[in-house]
Regions:
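N-terminal helicase ATP-binding lobe
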Residues: 1-190, 194-308, 314-341, 345-566
Length: 566
């Protein structure tokens, strides 16, 4: 093999939280220097076998899907075998189906609408379905022989199992089905964001596969390993700008009318409200927009016509956007997987640069979610303490009566065979993947609220950027000046200026003396801070109409000495 696995690490006696322990003894990591998945793995494929699953971790745009179409599918067809591709969202599935139709000269490509293509799954030796359709696909008796001829099962966007676990209680069951029912096929998992799903994937492949073959058929198992191919990530094309509220980008949108914006809101209501506040230059889509012309344009042509597209997480794993005019992405999430998946929807061309406007969560919202996660974990612990199915069923029924979907998602019912094998029984189970995700998120929020780290520091590490480089506030202040050069500032512009000055003041090493009043600082207070900031040669002056304006100003020598000392 071209990329030899790293040696197993020496065993360290260390207490690791259960939600943070990765089965490193099962994963064999291959550090791949290439930036092309197809070029790097073309000579690896022939070494793969069903006992050893494959995880391809590569940044969006490195050709994971191209590798499937140009390497895996031709190999399967040449051996008269089949390929099953499982994708996350319907939109992603449509894009893949269009590409398959082009490859096979399928006449349906020019006859069907996008809605019609969504309903197509059968492409002969190739089938494309969503994760949500998997159980129905496995129950289809007429497809039994087709499934027996599978050579590859491709689980695209494999972070689905954890990213969707908080609103899809069957993610764990879907993962179990893949590792169990497709144990004789080569299973290829692909994602750009693996950190949350590494542990569940490893445990499912190690446990369920053995259950499927080792105990059921009694076959002798050869040595198994999970091949983990890790490709280099490059985030140099992104400039990070942190904002306190999504409203702050409105002034920048007005200043950059020639640039397109992709805005991810954390709720439908907020998205619709924000889109409406921008007027005719913005459009809004969400999960209910599948029949809209805007959605059809995105799916088929991978671009939008408006200056601003406001959406929810419906796009985070669904649609790719190829449009050089999109130079700004606004993101309202603190979840690492979701954030990077949103960023990845915009595919970059050579020399392209994109500004990421990332909304920092407030302490109030962090505290509220920390309490929610703590309450949910306590419920799961209460469920685990119950010994009988009758007790567990009563416990869950009480939750269902309460009607809180955030709590109901923690449990589900499963039909299994009774021990006497003559009848079935209904089991009440906990959503183990949801428990795992909640525990990880609770730990992350706890670090933010305790002061152990900051949101900016964490996000900067996700993009491999030093914190001081993540947002050059001085450049933003200069941009603000150039846009509003010595002109009266509006009521909307003044809060932006206040924020820039306070951030620069703190970055210069000073402690903000009025942290609870930064949103109401007066002209003199802001000028006092400007006088102490290195290279901040600006001052706020007042016009005859009592309005503020930002002007160039070289502060006196005393201040200059302070600047040189910093």
């Amino acid at each position: 093999m071209l990329y030899q696995p790293k040696e197993k690490p020496q065993v360290r006696i260390e207490r690791i939280p259960w939600w943070n322990a990765i089965p490193d003894d099962f994963y064999f990591k291959h550090e791949v220097p290439s930036r092309s998945v197809k070029d790097a793995l073309a000579n690896e494929v022939d070494y793969w076998r069903a006992e050893c699953p494959v995880l391809i971790e590569a940044q969006t745009g490195l050709g994971k899907t191209t590798f499937v179409y140009e390497e895996l599918i031709p190999r399967a067809l040449s051996r008269h075998k089949n390929v099953l591709i499982i994708s996350n969202r319907i939109a992603l599935s449509v894009q893949q189906k269009i590409r398959i139709m082009k490859m096979t000269d399928d006449p349906r490509r020019d006859l069907l609408t996008d809605l019609g293509i969504q309903k197509c799954e059968d492409f002969g030796a190739i089938r494309i379905i969503t994760y949500h359709r998997l159980h129905e696909f496995l129950r289809a008796e007429n497809l039994k022989k087709w499934r027996e001829q599978l050579l590859y099962v491709v689980a695209d966007e494999a972070h689905f199992f954890t990213s969707d676990a908080l609103f899809n209680r069957y993610c764990g069951s879907i993962l179990q089905s893949i590792t169990t029912y497709f144990s004789r096929a080569i299973r290829v998992y692909m994602t750009a964001t693996s950190w949350d799903v590494l542990k569940p994937l490893g445990e499912a492949e190690r446990g369920n596969y053995l259950n499927a073959l080792g105990t059921v058929t009694g076959e002798v198992m050869r040595d198994r390993r999970f091949h983990h191919y890790i490709f280099p990530f490059d985030y140099s094309a992104y400039c990070l700008c942190f904002i306190k509220s999504i409203e702050e980008v409105k002034i920048h949108i007005k200043q950059k009318r020639q640039e397109k914006w992709l805005v991810f809101c954390n709720s439908r209501d907020k998205g619709k409200e924000f889109s409406e506040s921008l007027g005719d230059v913005a459009s809004y889509i969400d999960a209910d927009s599948k029949k809209d012309t805007i959605w059809a344009e995105l799916v088929r042509h991978e671009r939008f016509d408006e200056q601003i597209l406001v959406t929810t997480a419906v796009l985070d794993c669904g649609v790719n956007i190829h449009d050089e005019a999109v130079k700004n992405i606004v993101i309202c999430t603190d979840d690492r997987t979701s954030l990077l998946q949103m960023v990845g929807r915009k595919r970059l061309g050579p020399q392209e640069k994109v500004t990421l406007w990332i909304v920092e969560p407030s302490k109030k919202s962090l505290s509220a979610r920390l309490m929610q996660y703590s309450r949910q974990l306590e419920m799961i612990q209460s469920f685990d303490s119950l010994k009988t199915q009758k007790e567990r069923s009563s416990f869950v029924n009480r939750l269902l009566e309460n009607g809180d979907p955030k709590e109901n998602i923690l449990f589900y019912t499963s039909v299994t065979q009774h021990p006497d094998k003559r009848r079935e029984r209904l089991l009440v189970c906990k959503n183990q993947l949801a428990e795992y995700v909640i525990a990880r998120r609770k730990a992350f929020l706890g670090k933010l609220l305790s002061g152990e780290t900051t949101f900016q520091e964490e996000v900067s590490t996700w993009f491999d950027k030093p914190t001081e480089e993540s947002a050059d506030t001085l450049e933003l202040l200069e941009e603000f000046y150039q846009t509003n050069a010595e002109k009266p500032l509006s009521k909307e512009q003044i809060p932006i200026l206040r924020k820039l000055i306070v951030e620069l003041y703190c970055k210069a090493g000073y402690t903000e003396p009025q942290p609870t009043r930064t949103e109401s600082l007066k002209q003199n207070a802001l000028n006092n801070r400007l006088s102490k900031i290195p290279n901040a040669d600006y001052r706020i002056e007042e016009t005859s109409e009592k309005m503020w304006k930002l002007v160039r100003y070289e502060w006196p020598q005393a201040s200059g000495e302070i600047k040189r000392q910093l």
